[in-house]
Amino acid sequence: MQAIILDTETHSLNGLPIEIAYAPIQIQAGKLTLDKSQIFDQLYSIGDEKISYGAMAVHHILEQDIVDQPHFDTFQLPSETFYIIGHNIDYDIRTIEKCGVDSSKIKAICTLALARRAWPDAEAHNISALIYMISK
């Protein structure tokens, strides 16, 4: 089984990807393993598009950070990726589809949906709030 934990950053809400990161994981006999040498994290250029100030405030990626980076449409998923895991993962999948990725055979596992189900009364379900809540 090939699964990745995926996160993207975009130039605006529902925009083009300017950073794509993933960590391939293996799950065997109920144990999750991660080979840190296989972690992928790449900034991408978006042509003449400008990064919105709202997006900059979220991810702190500035326009000068993506100068001379590969164009976003060069991104490819690792071969034989069957599962993509992430927080609000549908957003990230829509983002990588803008790179030309075919996600039709990929199964999404949304940690936001899982968190809402596990802790329905939590004050917030974003990753930062969950970390504080779980680590109490």
Q: Locations of the language-model features?
A:
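Conserved non-catalytic scaffold segment of RNase H-like nuclease domains
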Residues: M1-K107, P120-K136
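Short, flexible loop segments at boundaries between secondary-structure elements
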Residues: L112-D121
